[in-house]
Every structure is written in structure tokens, then in C-alpha cells.
From Swiss-Prot:
The modification Omega-N-methylarginine is found at residue 81. Pfam families: NYAP_C, NYAP_N. The modification Phosphotyrosine is found at residue 268. This is Neuronal tyrosine-phosphorylated phosphoinositide-3-kinase adapter 2. Residues 149-166, 398-412, 461-481, 519-528 have a biased composition (Low complexity). The modification Phosphoserine is found at residues 120, 206, 434. Signal peptide: none annotated.
Length: 653
């Protein structure tokens, strides 16, 4: 303001004002310069101080480094490893130098330990250090023990053992005896237990007899596992303790598994045998359930197989009842033990069919009966068709099993038919015999239970026999096994003998009437067959078969030679069978023999004699040549029956 006033008032004062302004500006510049210089000085001072401090720190660091390096070098020289110094140097560089250096440096033993590790890693041999290291490294074997304990877990054990092995291999190589024995024992023990444990797991999956086996291996594996867990303690102690530990665990596992197994087995058995038990109870034909079950086990299998082949033949009563519970199983007849009855129906027909065929020509009544039986059970064609498959299966099985096994198979499948007849028809074999037949036969006999209406069933038997006789000849191939054939002949003889006795036994009047008819027919047949036999039994059989044969199924026909053979064999066998039974039912026997169905009586009643008869029969059957599968079963049965009847008559004479 002053300057402005001055300027405004006195223009002369302008230079003064300018001067003052100039001075002010110069002062400001000087001040700014000083401030800047001061700041720069301060900065420089700070930098210098900083540098000095940094230098001092760096010097200290350098000194420390030198000290550490010197110490490391001294340690390395003392240890006597030139490269060790370099290694230590590396170690220091890697880690905080101060920390590792003093550790390595100060405790010589520790340093030696480090050196030992380096040695082991480098595979440097130092016996003293190695021994000390080995002692120290025994802990790694402890980890192995842990894996061994984990071996029970199996998966962890394997991984841990593998890792421990890989980590400790160098140690083992370098370590003295201690690490090795532990490692070896562990490795040895561990691998065997693993296999055993694996079987145990499998056994657990299939807890059957395997479950028992499982526990045995488990015990062994468990002791090993326990030993592994106890490896820390002396080897001897863990081994001693192992058995106890194993026993405890094994027993517990067994108990639990046993309970489970029992339950599962119980269910399984129920599935298996309930039908037979029910049949046995319903039939109450003096069949022992025990015998049935015991026999069932063996014969049932062949029966089931046969049943499969015979599935075409619908079971008369039992199978029909079973299907609802197991609709799908019907297609799979073998699984159901009940199905054996289906073959039984066919075979029973075959058992009686010889009589009916012989008498059918003479006895129209019987033929009517056969018609009746067909509706009752299944169409004769079904039965014959069923029988051929059955016969084939039995032949194959008999051949494979051999005479001895063939006999059981025959007894299991063919005998049941006879059993059924015995229990329900005048022919009915002795009950004791029926009981003896395998459970399958019992099941079959029981199957007729639905047929149990004695009059219709008996009538059906007589009639169906005539019709099923065609199928029955096929059943003969079924026994085709030599044993089977012989047994069939013997059974036929016994069967023939049985009719009279069975008549008295069986209270069913229709059966008795049928038997009387059969006997009359037999006598007629014997006479006629003796005459015919001289002529041509084969031709007559074919005619009778045509007349009688309801089954259109082509069944293996017996060549005339085979027929003659069969007749001859049957003639020999009937006599033997008669001797066996001690009954003169030869004609009946021959007819049945023609069918070659094994009567359970023979099988059950005469076990000792059966083998012989079966062998002979087996030959006769083989010689007789199971009918080739072309001729109707009726044809075969008629031919066989005719040939056999003459032979039986000749034997009687």
C-alpha cells in the first residue's frame, strides 16, 4: 500500500519501491538456497550415517560369515572329511547360517550325527558312526512296527511298509544287524499276513466252510500283525504275546461271523430243504426226514439236473403249487428241489408203464386208466418227452459217475417214481424202501401226494404206465448207466414181487383192482409173450406201441439187435432180480425192466445186493444199448417188455 501510495503520490519514489522489491526477492532467493542446501546437507548426512551403519552391519556380517566358515572348516578337518566342509558350507547357505553352524559346530556328537546322516545319504562308510547311526535309526524300524500294526488295516500297512522300506533301505544296508533283522522280520511277516488277510476277506464275503478257514489264516495273520505292533519290544516277546492277542481277536471275529453264518446258512437251508420237509410231512409215508435230507443232498443234485431236463413234464401237483412262490424258478427247475417230483411222475409212470403196456393190449380198462392218468398228470407225450431228456441226462451222469455213482443217481431219480408208486399204488414199494430212496425220490413220491387221491392216482398209474411206458423206455436210457440198468432190472423184479405184498399193504381198492388186472394181464402177457418171443417180440412191441402209444415224441428206438440184447440181459437180470427179491414177479419185472426204471425198493432195500445187480444191469443196459433217440418210448418199452417178458418166463420155467 505504501509503495502504491508513493507511486501514486510521488512518481519519484518508484525507483525506491523497485529497489525494495529487488532486495526482497534477493532475500527470498538466498533463503531458498540456504534451505535447499541445508536439506541437501541433512540428506547427505543421513546417507552417510546410513552408509556407516550399513557398513558396520555388513562388516559384522562378513566377520560372522568368516567365523562360521572357519569353524565349519575346522569341524570338517577334525571329522576328516574335506568335502564335509563344503557340504556344511552349503548347509549354511541353505539355512540361517547362525543357527545351523553352531549346532553342527558345538555338539561334536551331533555334528557326527549330521555327518553320519550325510554319510548314510552319501553311502559313506563309517563303522563307528554307522553303528551309532544304526542305533539311532532303529526308530525307523519302529515306524515299520506301526505299519505292521496297520497291516491289519492292510492298505495303510502296504503303503507305510513300502515307504519305510524305501526310506530305510540305505539304513538297512549301512545299519548293522539290528535294523536288518527288524526290517527283514517285518518284511517277511508282513507279506504272508497280507495273503492270509486277503483270504479272510474273501472268506468273509463267502462265509461258508471258507469262513472257518478264514479264521485259521486270520489267527496267523493276527499274530503277525500283533508282533509287528509289538516290534518295539524284543522280537521274542511280541511273538509270545502274539498268540494271546490273536486268539482274542480271532475268537471274537469268529463268534460274530459264526452268528452271521449260522443265520445265513439257516436261511439257505430253509430255501433248500423246506419243500422236502413239507412233502415228507404231508406224505408221512414212513419217510424219515433225516434220511430224506441226508439223501437229498447227494441225489438232489442229479435229480435237479434231471428235473431240468424233465422240466417239460409238468409236475402233477407239487410243482404247480410251488410256482406261485417261485414263478421265475419254474423255468429254472433245477434250483427248486421240489422239481425232482416232475421226473418222478414220469419215472413212476415208467415204473408201472411196463405192466400197463403189457396189459394194456389185453386190458382196455387199463388203457382207459392210462388216459385218466394222462389228464391227471401230464399228456403222455409230455411225460415221454420229459423222460427222454431225463434219460439222456442220467445216462451222461451215470457214465461219468461210474457204476457206483450211477447207482445213486439212478436211485435218486428213477427210484423216486417207484417210491411214489409204492406209497400210493398197490405196486407201492415197501415203505421202508420208499424211505430209503434219496430225498429226491421222496420228493417225487411226495409230488404224487397231490395225486394222492389213491383211486385216480392208481388208475392213472396203471393207465399212465401204459402210456408213459413209451417214455419209460426212455427212462431206461436214463438208468442207462450200467448200474442204473441193473438196478432197474432188480427194481423191476422187486417191483413185480412188491405188487402182491403191496396190494395187501395198500388199502386202496382201486390199486388192488388194478393189480389184479395187472396180474391177469401179466399171465396173459407171459403166455402171449412166450409165443411172441419165439416169433418176433420186436414186431409185436412196435404194434403194441402203435396201439398204445399216446406219446408222439420220437424216442430212441432199440434196434432189433439191441432189443434182443436187452431181452437177453433182462432175462438174466430178472432171474437175478427175482432171486434178490425172492419173488416170482418176473413178468412184471421184465416189463419194468423194459422201462429200466430203478425201483427205490431195490435201491433202498438191497444196498449190498444192488451194487452187483447194478453192475450186471449196467452191462445189460450198455449192451442193450440205450434206445437210440428215434423210436417212441412206447415202442421201446413194448419191445423191451416183450423181450424181457419172454426172458423172465424162460427164467421161471
Amino acid at each position: 500500500m505504501i509503495s502504491s501510495k508513493m507511486m501514486s503520490s510521488n512518481p519519484e519514489e518508484d525507483p525506491l519501491d523497485t529497489f525494495l522489491q529487488y532486495i526482497e526477492d534477493m532475500g527470498m532467493k538466498a533463503y531458498d538456497g540456504l534451505v535447499i542446501q541445508n536439506a541437501s546437507d541433512i540428506a547427505r548426512e543421513n546417507d552417510r550415517l546410513r552408509n556407516e551403519t550399513n557398513l558396520a552391519y555388513l562388516k559384522e556380517k562378513n566377520e560372522k560369515r568368516r567365523r562360521q566358515e572357519e569353524a565349519i572348516k575346522r569341524i570338517g578337518g577334525e571329522v576328516g572329511r574335506g568335502h564335509e566342509g563344503s557340504y556344511v558350507g552349503k548347509h549354511f547357505r541353505m539355512g540361517f547360517m547362525t543357527m545351523p553352524a553352531p549346532q553342527d559346530r558345538l555338539p561334536h556328537p551331533c555334528s557326527s550325527g549330521f555327518s553320519v546322516r550325510s554319510q548314510s545319504l552319501h553311502s559313506v562308510g563309517g563303522t563307528d558312526d554307522d553303528s551309532s547311526c544304526g542305533s539311532r535309526r532303529q526308530p525307523p524300524p519302529k515306524p515299520k512296527r506301526d505299519p505292521s500294526t496297520k497291516l491289519s488295516t492292510s492298505s495303510e500297512t502296504v503303503s507305510s511298509t513300502a515307504a519305510s522300506k524305501s526310506g530305510k533301505t540305505p539304513e538297512r544296508t549301512e545299519a548293522s544287524a539290528k535294523p536288518r533283522p527288524h526290517s527283514d522280520e517285518y518284511s517277511k511277516k508282513i507279506p504272508p499276513p497280507k495273503p492270509k488277510r486277503n483270504p479272510n476277506t474273501q472268506l468273509s464275503t463267502s462265509f461258508d466252510e471258507t469262513y472257518i478257514k478264514k479264521h485259521g489264516p486270520r489267527r496267523t495273520s493276527l499274530p503277525r500283525d500283533s508282533s509287528l505292533s509289538q516290534m518295539g519290544s524284543p522280537a521274542g516277546d511280541p511273538e509270545e504275546e502274539e498268540p494271546v492277542y490273536i486268539e482274542m481277536v480271532g475268537n471274537i471275529l469268529r463268534d460274530f461271523r459264526k452268528e452271521d453264518d449260522d443265520q445265513s446258512e439257516a436261511v439257505y437251508e430253509e430255501m433248500k430243504y423246506p419243500i422236502f420237509d413239507d412233502l415228507g410231512q404231508d406224505a408221512k409215508c414212513d419217510f424219515d426226514h433225516h434220511s430224506c435230507s441226508s439223501q437229498c443232498a447227494t441225489p438232489t443234485v442229479p435229480d435237479l439236473d434231471f428235473a431240468k431236463a424233465s422240466v417239460p413234464c409238468p409236475p402233477k401237483g407239487l410243482l404247480c403249487d410251488i410256482p406261485p412262490p417261485f414263478p421265475n424258478l419254474l423255468s429254472h427247475r433245477p434250483p427248486l428241489l421240489v422239481f425232482p417230483p416232475a421226473p418222478v411222475h414220469c419215472s413212476p409212470n415208467s415204473d408201472e408203464s411196463p405192466l400197463t403196456p403189457l396189459e394194456v393190449t389185453k386190458l382196455p380198462v387199463l388203457e382207459n386208466v392210462s388216459y385218466m392218468k394222462q389228464p391227471a398228470g401230464a399228456s403222455p407225450s409230455t411225460l415221454p418227452s420229459h423222460v427222454p431228456g431225463h434219460a439222456k441226462l442220467e445216462k451222461e451222469q451215470a457214465a461219468a459217475l461210474g457204476p457206483a455213482s450211477a447207482t445213486p443217481a439212478l436211485s435218486s431219480s428213477p427210484p423216486p417214481p417207484s417210491t411214489l408208486y409204492r406209497t400210493q399204488s398197490p405196486h407201492g414199494y415197501p415203505k421202508s424202501h420208499s424211505t430209503s430212496p434219496s430225498p429226491v425220490s421222496m420228493g417225487r413220491s411226495l409230488t404224487p401226494l397231490s395225486l394222492k387221491r389213491p383211486p385216480p392216482y392208481d388208475a392213472v398209474h396203471s393207465g399212465s404206465l401204459s402210456r408213459s411206458s413209451p417214455s419209460v423206455p426212455h427212462s431206461t436210457p436214463r438208468p442207462v448207466s450200467q448200474d442204473g440198468a441193473k438196478m432197474v432190472n432188480a427194481a423191476v423184479n422187486t417191483y413185480g414181487a412188491a405188487p402182491g405184498g403191496s396190494r395187501s399193504r395198500t388199502p386202496t381198492s382201486p390199486l388192488e383192482e388194478l393189480t389184479s388186472l395187472f396180474s391177469s394181464g401179466r399171465s396173459l402177457l407171459r403166455k402171449s409173450s412166450s409165443g411172441r418171443r419165439s416169433k418176433e417180440p420186436a414186431e409185436k412191441s412196435t404194434e403194441e406201441l402203435k396201439v398204445r402209444s399216446h406219446s408222439t415224441e420220437p424216442l430212441p428206438k432199440l434196434d432189433n439187435k439191441e432189443r434182443g440184447h436187452h431181452g437177453a440181459s433182462s432175462s438174466r437180470e430178472p432171474v437175478k432180480a427175482q432171486e434178490w427179491d425172492g419173488t416170482p414177479g418176473t413178468p412184471v419185472v421184465t416189463s419194468r425192466l423194459g422201462r429200466c426204471s430203478v425201483s427205490p425198493t431195490l435201491l433202498a432195500g438191497n444196498h449190498s445186493s444192488e451194487p452187483k445187480v447194478s453192475c450186471k444191469l449196467g452191462r445189460s443196459a450198455s449192451t442193450s444199448g440205450v434206445p437210440p433217440p428215434s423210436v417212441t418210448p412206447l415202442r421201446q418199452s413194448s419191445d423191451l417188455q416183450q423181450s424181457q417178458v419172454p426172458s423172465s418166463l424162460a427164467n421161471r420155467d
